[in-house]
């Protein structure tokens, strides 16, 4: 051995060790490792419905705010119905997968898992939702659906019960489809001007983050973190998002809607050694506190947005599902913790199902 090798081999060994750590497999937060709650031996009258028809057409959908002014805050009932009709198969898939994964993680019935895999496998084989002929509403549906599916999938993939161990070929097929959808989502939502980056971009980043962990793709993870930082740095000193304030009477509702994807991204990043909590002087914490205060007294939002706030969505407990990852990040206490416990359990199909089971299982068991 030469002197050069004798001197530098230990250093190279250390570099190799640390280099491996730097590229460790991506993981979800701890709660995703939970096993099946209690395996049931009966069939529970579970019936696997036929999978919704894979959507392979152009992602051209009417917006429910069609005809609204630039605030995009006035609902158009006719176009909303047209939107729901044309996207029915997609939302049926999203809701159905989240529901079946919830059921399987609770009961462990093989039929529940088989049905989930059949639905996802059917859409994966059709390469559904991959059209590059889309409008804004269409690309929005793509990323919402991806976040729903990947978010649910994570509970199967990382569960200590290892439900996918006997289904590796099908799992690989589905995950490759998720990865293709994520790559297209990155193309859909990259390089937007700052004035166009709003809650849609945050939801796109959440879908890519969930898929990054499901498929162990560091490039997708890095993109989601980058998009998170853009969002966090849009939050001003008072906890407002300027591009959501533009929504006038729905400004507070859209601030609340921006929180779930941001909180989930920060939670997943932290699980992988990237601590985003303090980004832009703890902007995510500031945003959450502002929304919680605004839900009780919306005057500050009304003053900033210039209109009285529509509080309909703020009265729905399920709209606060972001409290689960957010409280895990910032250690909620006192009144905020009480509000969270009062509203639990949180079940959001767009975030992959039952978040209380993932983030606060002791509370889930009391329900």
From Swiss-Prot:
Its EC number is 4.2.2.3. Catalyzes the depolymerization of alginate by cleaving the beta-1,4 glycosidic bond between two adjacent sugar residues via a beta-elimination mechanism. May serve to degrade mislocalized alginate that is trapped in the periplasmic space. GO terms for molecular function: poly(beta-D-mannuronate) lyase activity. It catalyses: Eliminative cleavage of alginate to give oligosaccharides with 4-deoxy-alpha-L-erythro-hex-4-enuronosyl groups at their non-reducing ends and beta-D-mannuronate at their reducing end. Substrate binds at residues 63-64, 136-137, 254. The gene is algL. Its main location: periplasm. One of its GO terms (cellular component) is periplasmic space. Belongs to the polysaccharide lyase 5 family. It holds the Pfam family Alginate_lyase. InterPro entries: Alginate_lyase (IPR022859), Alginate_lyase_dom (IPR008397), Chondroitin_lyas (IPR008929). GO terms for biological process: alginic acid catabolic process. The keyword Electron transport does not apply. It comes from the Bacteria. It comes from Pseudomonas putida (strain W619). Keywords: Lyase, Periplasm, Signal. Residues 1-24 form the signal peptide. It is found in: Periplasm. This is Alginate lyase.
